[in-house]
Amino acid sequence: MPIVDSGSVAPLSAAEKTKIRSAWAPVYSNYETTGVDILVKFFTSTPAAQEFFPKFKGLTTADQLKKSADVRWHAERIINAVNDAVVSMDDTEKMSMKLGDLSGKHAKSFQVDPQYFKVLAAVIADTVAAGDAGFEKLMSMICILLRSAY
């Protein structure tokens, strides 16, 4: 299932939730390293996205990105937001509220181009559970909610 950022997706089944939690647990237990790896992969594969992060200006190599405290801080925030979604899979209202707030910040305060949510979600999905339709469905849910303020 390709990741989408508009429309709607079917609710996650109990089996999909179980599989997502199993795939996510080892990732989140090492969230600092994994988060940085995900963000570095995102920026090296999509350098135009870096323009929305003024603190990352001048960081042009993967090594520079990995060593940046600002990159590490933002990577942690991203991983924690995904973790919040994983934890909230049984409470979609809570997930909608948290990600809706995050959408508003990205749309109004940071003016991030929403096309990059789907690109980053694909990097996360590939890192966590490559090819798993349930995890891709969760990433789609996140992307749709992150676009809600646009």
UniProtKB/Swiss-Prot annotation:
Domain of life, source organism: Eukaryota
Query: Which residues are involved in binding heme b?
Result: 74, 106
**Span of domain Globin:** 11-150
Instruction: Quote the Gene3D superfamilies the UniProt record gives.
Output: Globins
What molecular function does GO assign, one term?
heme binding
Q: Of which family is this protein a member?
A: Belongs to the globin family.
* Protein name, as recorded: Globin-3
Q: From which source organism is this entry?
A: Petromyzon marinus
